Amino acid sequence: MARIAGIDLPKEKRVEIGLTYIYGIGLPTSQKILKETGVNSDTRVKDLTEEEVNLLRNYIKNLKIEGDLRREVALNIKRLIEIGSYRGIRHRKGLPVRGQKTKTNARTRKGPKKLVGAKKKSK
């Protein structure tokens, strides 16, 4: 099992897909990494040689991934909140940030519905 950037890549998957298990590396970035390192994208992770794994590690070492990337995103959101921008206010309130409507939908961002209790009718 190849371990790159502190992540165990799944053995049975192709390298191209396996690299996407690292936070900050999607399919296009994965394809670019393989093209520039010269590793065949159809190779399974379990079939990688130690030399190929080291090539991938050295290339990925220069990218902003995992903890560094998560920290940067969190700091960017924190900065927006502190300066009081519109986007920061939306983050603080837990509402959609990118202009989506909220009259209906937006349940993922707002959380489950908060039901208001209905009074029982007296006879």
Curated annotation (Swiss-Prot):
Residues 92-123 are annotated as: Disordered. This is Small ribosomal subunit protein uS13. One of its GO terms (biological process) is translation. Keywords: Ribonucleoprotein, Ribosomal protein, RNA-binding, rRNA-binding, tRNA-binding. Part of the 30S ribosomal subunit. Forms a loose heterodimer with protein S19. Forms two bridges to the 50S subunit in the 70S ribosome. It comes from the Bacteria. Belongs to the universal ribosomal protein uS13 family. InterPro entries: Rbsml_uS13_C, Ribosomal_uS13, Ribosomal_uS13-like_H2TH, Ribosomal_uS13_bac-type, Ribosomal_uS13_CS.
